[in-house]
Amino acid sequence: RDTFMDNAWWGTAPDADIVLVALDQATCTHADITNAIEYIFDYATEVGKPCVVNLSLGNHDGPHDGTSSFDRMADTMQGPGRIIVGAAGNHRKDAFHLSRTFTTAGDDPLRTFIAFKQQPTKDSYGGEVQIWAEQGMDIEVTLSAYSVFNKKDMTTVTIYPAEGQQTVKLGSYATGTMTVASEVNPTNGKLNILIT
């Protein structure tokens, strides 16, 4: 109970048990998270209480349409007295997601800047871009090295449709390596392109 300034309000669930599961962030997989959820639900069954599992994961991968293997797993684990809640996240000001609806092949391209992490450590170097396109869309993805001094693209290369590792000349003295992989997702039929 909050007694500050004679507050008469109690907490939302004053008789709730709090069950914490620690996972190693560096090696955590969706299977580990699934096992943690199962552990919490098993505890709730043992003590005869309903259960809400809060997942504040900060994960931005996947199609965001409920068809990922993790989303489908979460759906099957929920039921009467068992709810999984996904937190909205702390990235409101970060430009993590971008979308565009194209109506014809003549539409202007979608352009954006991508800032990859630049510290040369194992945990913070690099980055990835996931592109999801609706079934049957014919798309092309190009990468450009943009000069902040000249305010223009210095070089542009088509990276999809193409597969494998490519070395891209970014300027007179700089090169970068990226890997492009793609598939038509067997669950939702959408084209998925991963650039790392």
Regions found by a protein language model. Give the residues of each.
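Subtilisin-like serine protease catalytic core
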Residues: 1-31, 48-49, 79-83, 96, ...
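Short regulatory "switch" loops immediately downstream of catalytic or recognition motifs
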Residues: 1-3, 42-43, 145-149
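Residue-level detector of functional hotspots within protein domains
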Residues: 2-4, 39, 76, 179
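Short acidic, glycine-rich surface-loop motifs adjacent to enzyme active sites
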Residues: 22, 37-65, 87-88
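Solvent-exposed, acidic/flexible segments
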Residues: 26-34, 63, 67
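Extracytoplasmic/secreted envelope proteins and their assembly/folding machinery
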Residues: 34-37, 71
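Substrate-binding/specificity loop regions of serine endopeptidase catalytic domains
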Residues: 58-196
